[in-house]
Amino acid sequence: MKKLQLINLIVIISFLFISCESLKTATFDQHSYQKATEIKVMSSQLMDQATYPYNDYEKEVTNLLSELDKIVEYEKNKPYNDISLEMWKILSDKERNLLAGFLKRWKEQNKMSEVFVEQAKSQVIEAIDLIINYEANKSKESKD
């Protein structure tokens, strides 16, 4: 009977350990935070130019898309970082309506209306702010 109780206790402790492991969040990463703020500024400045011909800013667009690819690769290799990684993937997905999708449409249409740019920009900036805030809050969580 004591052996059965010990086995049950071990099983319960194992399940608790496994469930706690799945709730882990990556710790604060200064590089991730800094890159997110840099990408926010770059995105804001570049999106403001979308009322002009795409060809005039093709180099800057390529550079920004490269920065997105780099941060996705960086975030992919951090343990317990699924949420941040998914947020970056959504932002960099050319088939969605955030940053990479906006840049793709700019290339296809050559110029965007000022109204569209402002609306799209507010959504992109809000999405990047969510990433920045999530990363900043990791610092508080990891201290607890």
Residues covered by each model-derived region:
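A structural signal for well-ordered alpha-helices, especially hydrophobic packing surfaces
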Residues: 40-43, 47, 68-75, 96-103, ...
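Post-signal peptide N-terminal segment of mature Sec-exported envelope proteins
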Residues: 27-49
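Bacterial signal peptide processing site
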Residues: 21-24
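C-terminal motif of bacterial Sec signal peptides marking the signal peptidase cleavage site
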Residues: 16-19
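Alpha-helical segments in soluble extracytoplasmic regions
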Residues: 48-86
